[in-house]
A protein has these predicted regions:
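N-terminal phosphate-binding loop and adjacent alpha-helix
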Residues: 19-69, 152, 157, 192
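Residue-level signal for inorganic ion chemistry
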Residues: 11, 59, 128, 158, ...
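N-terminal glycine-rich anion-binding loops that anchor highly charged ligand groups
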Residues: 9-17
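Phosphate-binding/catalytic loop of phosphoryl-transfer enzymes
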Residues: 72, 77-84, 89-161, 191-202, ...
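ATP-binding/phosphotransfer module of carbohydrate and carboxylate kinases, centering on a glycine-rich
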Residues: 27, 154-260
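Conserved small/polar residues in nucleotide/adenosyl-binding loops
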Residues: 1-5
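Short glycine-rich phosphate-binding loop at a beta-alpha junction
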Residues: 52-62, 81-83, 213-225
Length: 260
């Protein structure tokens, strides 16, 4: 059982190396551990998974206020104390950062999964509450990253701070140039974020010399709930792996459990 939290709580189950399901529950700071446990158990029941069959659990949390509540909820649901991704846990990743302990757990988990599934060098884009970009060099070192405002965060900020702009859906407009306010906003969100990703990739690739002077080209992997909305409009060749984080959690779990 793998769980990560942020704006949404992502819950999934992995059997051997296969992801059985991935679902999202809304993050609610007012909920008790019992309420979260009921939500987790309901999801398991929907997929006909008996909680007694769960043999292990791991959590990647970027919301400190919820760590203990989510941990207790998992214990109530499956009767297992979950592993927590964080300082002291084995990842197999060499992090060459000024403050390695400050690197977001999701960025680490994504990088671990990418190295295991796609190799190095690699650039990993995770489009969630924040849009993060992680860079792993040809020696499999985690060498840096980028953190941008997430797409929904940007839209919510735009709408809340401007009196005349409405909330919009995130479907693609007919043209890059809108003919009405809603399509203008959609173009800014969809094509603007795609252009941002392309621009950041250009700069990262150039800064690291990927693909020149004998250096291998970097594979570019994208994940997160909104990757499928933005990536099709990017000019770079980007592979979408919606299950990247759950795969990474399973790999890290295996590294930290005796007998694996």
């Amino acid at each position: 059982m793998c769980i990560r939290d942020s704006t949404n709580i992502v819950i999934g189950c992995v059997d051997d190396k296969k992801v059985l399901f991935e679902e999202r529950l809304s993050t609610d700071y007012s909920k008790t551990e019992l309420e979260y446990a009921i939500g987790f158990k309901t999801v398991l029941e929907i997929y006909n998974i008996n909680s007694d069959d769960i043999k292990g659990a791991i959590i990647s949390s970027v919301v400190p206020q919820l760590v203990n509540i989510i941990k207790a909820a998992v214990e109530k649901t499956v009767g297992i104390t979950p592993l927590m991704v964080g300082p002291g846990i084995k990842t197999g990743l060499n992090i060459l950062m000024d403050q390695p302990r400050q690197v977001g757990t999701d960025m680490i988990v994504d990088a671990v999964a990418t190295l295991n599934g796609y190799g190095a060098p690699a650039i990993i884009i995770d489009m969630g509450t924040a849009t993060t970009i992680s860079v792993v060099d040809e020696k499999e070192n985690y060498i840096g990253g980028v953190i941008l405002p997430g797409i929904r965060v940007s839209v919510d900020s735009l709408v809340s701070r401007t009196a005349q702009l409405p909330r919009i859906s995130l479907d693609t407009p007919k043209s890059v140039m809108g003919k009405n306010t809603i399509d203008c906003m959609k173009s800014g969100v969809i094509y603007g974020n795609a252009s941002c990703i392309d621009g950041m990739l250009d700069r990262i690739i150039e800064a690291n010399g990927f693909g020149v002077n004998g250096k291998p080209e970097a594979k570019v992997i994208a994940t997160g709930g909104l990757a499928k909305v933005i990536v099709p409009h990017c000019k770079h060749n980007i592979h979408i792996d919606a299950e990247l984080l759950l795969k990474g959690l399973r790999i890290i779990y295996d590294k930290n459990v005796e007998g694996n």
